[in-house]
Amino acid sequence: MKPDAHHVKQFLLRLQDDICQKLSAVDGANFVEDSWRREAGGGGRSRVLRNGGIFEQAGVNFSHVHGDAMPASATAHRPELAGRSFEAMGVSLVVHPHNPYIPTSHANVRFFIAEKPGADPVWWFGGGFDLTPYYGFEEDAVHWHRTARDLCQPFGDDVYPRYKKWCDDYFFLKHRNEQRGIGGLFFDDLNTPDFDHCFDFMQAVGNGYTRAYLPIVERRKAMVWGERERNFQLYRRGRYVEFNLVWDRGTLFGLQTGGRTESILMSMPPLVRWEYDWQPEAGSPEAALSEFIQVRDWI
């Protein structure tokens, strides 16, 4: 089947609505919407929930941008895209809770198509979701990965292990030699066996995010925390910032294509701290995190 960008866009708009509604229902606060236009073509709608009952900041962004030429970040490793017009659309979200016992979560699903007259379109899907805990709970990690495995299962036995490994490899801070979190799923350049199959998988990932995350929020939201836990959360959020600004391809693509900076950087935590050469106390729950986020098979 020929790629149908319109159908993808309609799904993404519904997905943004659905995720925002479910996060609001858990939190009690509402999202504020900010619609924007891109001068070079396209636009989007950014939604942010701030200082809610549970979430310090949750950002759920839809964007649909298009242009006559590809940015350098895309053509560097895809020379066949040179000279093509393009459309890129997606939903991207990051949730930063108040409570340090609730992990930060990130999800993204996207579609890209590049065309030129007289040639077949070049298209693919990408996306995934990943979890960044501050305090490790095995049952949360197992639930997160089991949900990921179950949504992958109808698409083949090899899908979950392949995209889990890709996620572990991608969300890695090379300059720190450590994982960002416990991973989940990451896929990109998905265009086989056909459009319908790939679109179905992208929808499964997008719809699976709240099933993976919200039970963890419910399980941890009543846990009591204090200044110690908060300081550790802010310190670890620094790793999140480092990854997004140094390593994340999506951030680079957005900035190079003249995307909306406020929306691109919506993933940043509202508060964060760095402390020179800080080390957690031996044997403490904070010290246990470095072992907890090591790559492993959770299920």
Swiss-Prot record:
InterPro entries given in the database record: Coprogen_oxidase_aer, Coprogen_oxidase_aer_sf, Coprogen_oxidase_CS
Location in or out of the cell: Cytoplasm
Residues binding substrate: S92, N108, V109, R110, G258, G259, R260
Any one Pfam family match given in the protein's UniProt record, by short name: Coprogen_oxidas
Binding sites annotated in the UniProt record for a divalent metal cation: H96, H106, H145, H175
Keywords: Cytoplasm, Heme biosynthesis, Metal-binding, Oxidoreductase, Porphyrin biosynthesis
Family: Belongs to the aerobic coproporphyrinogen-III oxidase family.
Protein name as annotated: Oxygen-dependent coproporphyrinogen-III oxidase
Species whose genome carries this gene: Salmonella paratyphi C (strain RKS4594)
Gene from which the chain derives: hemF
